[in-house]
Amino acid sequence: MAKKSMINRDIKRTKLVEKYKVKRLELKKIIKSINVSDEERFQATIKLQALPRDASPTRQRNRCALTGRPHGFYRKFGLARTKLRERTMNGEAPGLSKASW
């Protein structure tokens, strides 16, 4: 089980990412546009840097929904490998079964 503080920190980051998502996209669009002057591009870059660091989506971490484990995470199920295996063995994961050949 991950520390509650780490799980809460990731939840806080997720909220910040959602809050600033539109603003970040607009600023990035200005920065990448070739029709914008250098001064406007520079101002957009400064505004982007002024946004909170945790508002960047790359600072988010995928975590298991049950344990908060950050490694061995399967996006399709939202679970870490250990919990996914437990669910599979109990028949709780739809479409999964232990391989045998």
From Swiss-Prot:
Molecular function terms from GO: rRNA binding; structural constituent of ribosome
InterPro entries: Ribosomal_uS14, Ribosomal_uS14_bac/plastid
Family: Belongs to the universal ribosomal protein uS14 family.
Gene3D superfamilies: 1.10.287.1480
NCBIfam families tied to this protein: PRK08881.1
Keywords: Ribonucleoprotein, Ribosomal protein, RNA-binding, rRNA-binding
Species of provenance: Ruthia magnifica subsp. Calyptogena magnifica
The protein, known as: Small ribosomal subunit protein uS14
Biological processes annotated in GO: translation
Keyword Ribosomal protein: yes
Highest taxon above the source species: Bacteria
Gene: rpsN
GO CC terms: cytoplasm; small ribosomal subunit
Coiled-coil blocks: none
Role, per record: Binds 16S rRNA, required for the assembly of 30S particles and may also be responsible for determining the conformation of the 16S rRNA at the A site.
Pfam families: Ribosomal_S14
Quaternary structure and partners: Part of the 30S ribosomal subunit. Contacts proteins S3 and S10.
Keyword Ribonucleoprotein (UniProt): yes
